Amino acid sequence: MRKVLLLFILLSNFLFSQGPSNIATANRDLWKLPMKSTKDFDVASKLEMLVFLETFKDIDVLNESELFKTLGVKDGSSSGVKTWKKQTQDRLVSNFKDLEADALSEVISVKANPTFPELVLATKKLSNELPENLKNWYQNSKSFYKTYILECLRLAAKSNKRTSEINTLDPTEKNGFESKDKSYLLTFDDGPTQKNGHTDKLINILKEQHLNGIFFLSGDKLQQRIAANGKNNVASMYGENWIGSHSMVHKSHQYLPDWKLQIDESNSIIKDVFDFNNKTFYFRPPYGQRSPEIINYLLKNKQPILLWNIDSQDWSEKISSQEVSSRVITLMLLWRKGIILFHDVHPKAAVAVPAINEYFKDCQIKWLKPDEIQ
């Protein structure tokens, strides 16, 4: 067993030497059970959580030194890793309590309201009790979660030097885990693009799908769009979607000397275009990186931070539109609630969002409107 772990470490060192460019991708075509009801959703969710947990426990046997070496992180945050692990365990236990009773016995039997140790025991059934038509999905899922868990642990391990969405810094921050079961919010960063670009196409697709979300605008790109098309045209193009700020420039604000200027300038441009009467004006820090000083400054201006817990990774050239939708679907089943991060400056969200909506159309998930954020 020890030799297997050491091989895993060496392989992971190679894979993670390039950091976040290694992205967990799933293949939903390998899931051979129906997705036509709330029960079907819960059966799939249960199995995703069990495979995640099985992989989580495999990685958890690494000691701190081995883990940080695997992640390629020096002087990592022990507390950040411990916090993420504890929160993850608690979230999984809570998620199992939300499963329909008749889904508990399907495929892999799990007792009602299981404890974390009982869930660990249930994962031992996966290799022997899964039907033949789910074996390929199982192998793909294990590979997905191995990479995904390391994605999360890497963020947690680096949280002492670089903050991110992996942990909240203040009770007022929202990341999606505070939402109700099977409730999801769509969010889109970095726009707007120029006229008839990806932003415009995505807005039209959202309207066709009867969906909306929050667009976090970059002040510099908004200025360019206003200069090209006029303030009134920009103000009307987003329809029922809400607007948030992504600051003036897309740079990490955690150590940026003029972060206050960047925030204020972007806010001024956005508020000159959009009406925020009875609407919360959210802020999303670039890369999710912020400091307590930034949080306090924003709160004084009644501008809470909105993070995310489901990252589509749609910005990467290494992941296709189909892989984006499969990744998001898988994480929606795993976490059972959340804020989903897309980017409207790239084309993949316009393909992935309709595919995700179609996949879950019979499962009674709730697409949150911005004013329904918990």
Which role fits each region the language model picked out?
Residues 48, 144, 232-233, 323, ...:
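Exposed alpha-helical structural elements
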